């Protein structure tokens, strides 16, 4: 009778027990009353001991009633183990349950499934799921929730979604488990999709829902939706939960809205370490280094930072170049008891290096018993930053001797060293090691090698690497095209550009900034226009650098109007923009427009630099505006206080020389405060040849050879002057000197774009397409020109030939004439022609082209090394000032 009376009291006492000692006293009472064999009280004791983290006591209770014939007891002990993280034991007792004569019920499986999830044992989880299906418990809400949670935790989201979809009834736990699974495994779009489905149901999200879905909003950068979720959190009151506020802070930092993140942080009633860590690390990711460090230092008494936060702040000291602060953080870590693993020491090396203390950085490195790849990379990077490239190379060699594992970062750093030092031997050694270790498979390493070989003058090796690669990425193509442009191999550069356009690689702004100058150099107008259309499609036209490149491209492709149109449409202009437009007008002999543009530039508030004055004096020179050009030179010195460089003096000499003021040019040279170089005298020499002042030409030629005997361009210019004077001994001496020094002159060639093809011609070329027809066409033109009084100028023949016919043959075979004849043969009558030449047009070709334009009734635009010439009706736009 006493037992029956005492049972309800003991049951209530067990349920309300608040600590372990109280529970033990009640347990003793249960034993004294003989109730310890009761399944009911044993089950409650097992549950209560597990609640107080005493699974051993739970097991002891279970053993007193073994063999258990009631599933309630089995469920209690399995739940006790699972609840306390003893997942193997939980599954062990589930196995024993299966071996007994007792059948599991629907309450058994949530704890068993939790154990499978805790062990990440998908195979066991699938087996349990099959048993659930066999027993018909799959429709139970709690079993379904446990299965969704298990598969979600394991990242088996397809299975989780399948279980979720098949559940006849779902509660908030079901939705939360699935949302959390998708979000925690980076499937943010799916997480948002499930969240929106939840909002459309009758179930109201809670704090767990919000905290689970916040990372999805942040990572997908859906700002408006994220702000809407913040509003829901405020309205529903879940923002009072610290984990929700932490998620909101993280979300706004992902949105790059640190002000909003800080507002949420400041309004939090309760903050934990995660709150501070999130804010500090978020500032660092946004490169708000000072704010991050300030928050860390000001709140050290409010929270305990984790290792990630302290390490991040320590790294920030390197960015701030604050060595004393770094030492303070380091001492804090020691006092706080942080274990200084290699990661922290690697950061220390990096910080000391950035602060310029390589001695301490090396001491930290040398003191490390276990150095990993990051350690080596950190110290090597430090020496590279400090400019001690040789020590960086020594460390790499030491690394190889010690058989330490180098990674792609190591190779990228050392390849940059070999590039900076132009050390091809070391670079080839890196390449060889990279092939052996398999590092060269890394795309960034291959790109760096392409760049290294190109900058060391081995473009062929760059192209070999490129051809052995797969598709590569945008950087790959940009690097190869840039290499071709740098070394003047425009034909290959064009081929690579065409290949890139046919590939699936998406160009970036750097692509356009390297291909547009190439089109400008080649005067590849059609390709330039296609690239312009392409950059419009990708939205780059409004970029300032792109606008500047387009102005240059169109101006050098013979499309001055297009250059002007691009210039007018630009919403922003810098000094480069104005310089490009002024130079463009100069190339076409539009000196007045160049001066107007210069005046507009001054009115706009842009202060001209030294390069602008080179462009404006150049424009005046090619337009015969001597007084205006001299005025600009004086303005540069007196008004803008720019000290003239040799280039400015060369422009003024050219200005005077082109206007046949040769004596004034020489006077100007004599008055120069700096010693004139060959470029100064070259302008005078060209003017002498044009005017026929061969006495001055001979004197100037001697000066040029004395000043720069190794430059093929200046040497050939002097040689041609001596040839015009018929001083063949001087010509022979110059050519022998160049030959002995293995110096070769740039061969002259011209090209013309007809249809979609570019046709290139060299002087005397008889292997070109339609060669026979070209020469026949020229013969007809020469006979017509003779009637106009044309006589070939023998001064343009630089070889010692006695036969006049031989001289005539050489002159008549100049490359620009072949290109013009080809254009006449392959275009409709009256169609304007555009021919490009890599060298300066000779006087005889200039005269011939004027006559051809008159005879055939066509405009012929020729770009040579100096400027554009528009030939029309027997005249040239340069007015014979070229």
From Swiss-Prot:
Gene Ontology terms describing biological process: RNA modification
Region (Type E motif): 680-755
PPR repeats: from-to residues: 3-37, 38-68, 70-104, 105-139, 140-170, 171-205, 206-240, 241-271, 272-307, 309-340, 341-371, 372-406, 407-441, 442-472, 473-507, 508-542, 543-573, 574-608, 609-639, 645-675
Top-level taxon: Eukaryota
Gene3D superfamilies: Tetratricopeptide repeat domain
Chloroplast in keyword set: no
Region (Type E(+) motif), start-end ranges: 756-786
Disulphide bond pairs: none
Any one GO MF annotation of this record: zinc ion binding
Keywords in alphabetical order: Repeat
PROSITE patterns cross-referenced by the UniProt entry: PPR (PS51375)
Positions of the UniProt region annotated as Type DYW motif: 787-882
Xref: PANTHER family: DYW DOMAIN-CONTAINING PROTEIN, PENTATRICOPEPTIDE REPEAT-CONTAINING PROTEIN
Entry similarity comment: Belongs to the PPR family. PCMP-H subfamily.
UniProt-listed NCBIfam families: PPR
Full protein name: Pentatricopeptide repeat-containing protein At3g03580
Source organism per UniProt: Arabidopsis thaliana
């Amino acid at each position: 009778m006493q037992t029956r009376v005492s049972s309800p009291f003991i049951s209530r006492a067990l349920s309300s027990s608040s600590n372990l000692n109280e529970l033990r006293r009640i347990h003793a009472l249960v034993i004294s009353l003989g109730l310890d064999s009761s399944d009911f009280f044993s089950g409650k004791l097992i549950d209560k001991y597990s609640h107080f983290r005493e699974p051993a006591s739970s097991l002891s209770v279970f053993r007193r009633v073994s063999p258990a014939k009631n599933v309630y007891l089995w469920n209690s002990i399995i739940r006790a183990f699972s609840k306390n993280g003893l997942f193997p034991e939980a599954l062990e007792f589930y196995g024993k349950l299966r071996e007994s004569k007792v059948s599991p019920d629907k309450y058994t499986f949530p704890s068993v499934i939790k154990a499978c999830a805790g062990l990440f044992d998908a195979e066991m989880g699938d087996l349990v799921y099959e048993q659930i299906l066999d027993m018909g418990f799959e429709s139970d809400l709690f079993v379904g929730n446990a299965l969704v949670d298990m598969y979600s935790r394991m990242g088996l989201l397809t299975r989780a979604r399948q279980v979720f979809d098949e559940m006849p009834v779902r509660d908030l736990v079901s939705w939360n488990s699935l949302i959390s699974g998708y979000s925690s495994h980076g499937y943010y779009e799916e997480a948002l999709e499930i969240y929106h489905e939840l909002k459309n149901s009758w179930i109201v999200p809670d704090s767990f829902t919000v905290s689970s879905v916040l990372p999805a909003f942040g990572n997908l950068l859906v700002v408006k939706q994220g702000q809407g979720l913040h509003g829901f959190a405020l309205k529903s009151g879940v923002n009072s939960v610290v984990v929700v506020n932490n998620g909101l802070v993280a979300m706004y930092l992902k949105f790059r809205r640190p002000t909003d993140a800080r507002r949420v942080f400041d309004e939090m009633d309760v903050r934990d370490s995660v709150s501070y860590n999130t804010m500090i690390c978020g500032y660092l990711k946004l490169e708000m280094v000072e704010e991050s460090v300030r928050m860390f230092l000001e709140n050290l008494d409010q929270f305990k930072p984790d290792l990630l936060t302290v390490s991040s702040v320590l790294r920030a000291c390197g960015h701030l170049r604050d060595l004393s602060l770094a030492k303070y953080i380091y001492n804090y870590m020691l006092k706080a008891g942080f274990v200084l693993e290699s990661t922290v020491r690697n950061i220390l090396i990096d910080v000391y290096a950035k602060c310029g203390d390589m001695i301490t950085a090396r001491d930290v490195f040398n003191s490390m018993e276990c150095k990993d790849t990051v350690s080596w990379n950190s110290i090597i990077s430090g020496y590279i930053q400090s400019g001690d490239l040789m020590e960086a190379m020594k460390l790499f060699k030491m690394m190889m001797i010690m058989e330490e594992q180098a990674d792609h970062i190591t190779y990228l750093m050392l390849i940059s060293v070999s590039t900076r030092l132009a050390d091809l031997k070391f670079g080839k050694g890196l390449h060889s090691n990279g092939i052996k270790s398999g590092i060269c498979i890394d795309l960034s390493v291959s790109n760096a090698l392409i760049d290294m070989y190109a900058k060391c003058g081995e473009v062929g090796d760059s192209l070999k690497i490129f051809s052995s690669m797969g598709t590569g990425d945008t950087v790959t193509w940009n690097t190869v095209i840039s290499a071709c442009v740098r070394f003047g191999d425009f034909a290959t550069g064009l081929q690579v550009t065409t290949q890139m356009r046919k590939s699936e690689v998406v160009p970036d702004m750097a692509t356009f900034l390297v291909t547009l100058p190439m089109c400008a150099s080649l005067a590849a107008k059609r390709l330039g226009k296609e690239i312009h259309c392409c950059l419009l499609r990708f939205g780059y036209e409004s970029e300032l650098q792109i606008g500047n490149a387009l102005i240059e491209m169109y101006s050098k492709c013979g499309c001055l109007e297009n250059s002007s149109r691009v210039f007018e449409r630009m919403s922003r202009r810098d000094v480069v923009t104005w310089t490009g437009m002024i130079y463009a007008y100069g190339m076409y002999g539009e000196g007045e427009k160049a001066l107007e543009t210069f005046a507009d530039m001054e009115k706009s508030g842009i202060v001209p630099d030294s390069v602008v004055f080179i462009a404006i004096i150049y424009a005046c020179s090619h337009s015969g505006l001597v007084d205006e050009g001299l005025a600009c030179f004086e303005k540069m010195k007196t008004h803008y206080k720019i000290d003239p460089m040799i280039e400015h003096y060369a422009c003024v000499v050219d200005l005077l020389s082109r206007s046949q003021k040769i004596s004034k040019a020489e006077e100007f040279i004599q008055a120069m405060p700096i010693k004139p170089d060959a470029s100064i005298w070259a302008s005078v020499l060209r003017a002498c040849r044009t005017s026929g002042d061969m006495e001055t030409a001979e004197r100037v030629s001697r000066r040029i050879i004395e000043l720069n005997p190794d430059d093929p361009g200046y040497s050939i210019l002097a040689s041609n002057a001596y040839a015009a004077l018929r001083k063949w001994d001087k010509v022979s001496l110059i050519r022998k000197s160049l030959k002995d020094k293995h110096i070769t002159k740039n061969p002259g060639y011209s090209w013309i774009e007809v249809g979609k093809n570019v046709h290139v011609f060299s002087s005397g070329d008889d292997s070109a397409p339609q060669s026979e027809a070209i020469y026949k066409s020229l013969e007809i033109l020469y006979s017509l020109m003779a009637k106009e009084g044309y006589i070939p100028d023998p001064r343009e023949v630089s070889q010692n030939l006695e036969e006049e016919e031989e001289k005539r043959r050489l002159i008549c075979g100049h490359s620009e004439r072949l290109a013009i004849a080809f254009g006449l043969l392959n275009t409709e009558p009256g169609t304007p022609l555009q021919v490009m030449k890599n060298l300066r047009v000779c006087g005889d070709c200039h005269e011939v082209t004027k006559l051809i334009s008159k005879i055939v009734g066509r405009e012929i635009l020729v770009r040579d090394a100096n400027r554009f010439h528009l030939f029309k009706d027997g005249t040239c736009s340069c007015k014979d000032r070229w």
